């Protein structure tokens, strides 16, 4: 084999190895990639049943229903809503009128089945995805929560 052919052989082999590594990396990221949707995004775009994603917004007032360890509540972006079902312990800061981000998947009945629920850290914090969604919908209100959203003493 001449030097020229050997060099070409190594270059082609190196390119194949690079493409294989890139393909494996992208496949690994695809499995771990979790997208964020607002309730309006879900209405407009839809998501495949069983596909993992995050949904965020505000917990609608009067929507929290507890049945043993299972909790059902409605997440809204003040334009559309999505019903969420979660089994487990909710964060201490979870309450109606506050921002949440839930991670899980849609079931066949159109309910979002959450594997985890994240709540606001304090009265001034809102998850960035939720804030962007509310700004895009024109419903953004900057400042402290309203009296209805504040926790009971």
UniProtKB/Swiss-Prot annotation:
Ligand binding (heme):
121, 125
| Compartments where located | Cell inner membrane
Q: Does the keyword RNA-binding apply?
A: no
BP GO terms, sorted: cytochrome complex assembly
Q: Which domain of life is it from?
A: Bacteria
Instruction: Identify the residue ranges that face the Periplasmic compartment according to the record.
Output: 29-153
What stretches pass through the bilayer? 8-28
Give the record's membrane topology: Single-pass type II membrane protein
Going by the UniProt record, its keywords in alphabetical order are: Cell inner membrane, Cell membrane, Cytochrome c-type biogenesis, Heme, Iron, Membrane, Metal-binding, Signal-anchor, Transmembrane, Transmembrane helix
Q: Which Pfam families match?
A: CcmE (PF03100)
Q: Which residues lie on this side of the membrane: Cytoplasmic?
A: 1-7
The region annotated as signal peptide is: none
Low complexity bias: where?
Answer: 144-153
One MF term in the entry's GO annotations? metal ion binding
Q: Where is this region: Disordered?
A: 132-153
What task does this protein carry out? Heme chaperone required for the biogenesis of c-type cytochromes. Transiently binds heme delivered by CcmC and transfers the heme to apo-cytochromes in a process facilitated by CcmF and CcmH.
Family as reported in the entry's similarity comment: Belongs to the CcmE/CycJ family.
Annotated protein name in UniProt: Cytochrome c-type biogenesis protein CcmE
Q: Which gene encodes it?
A: ccmE
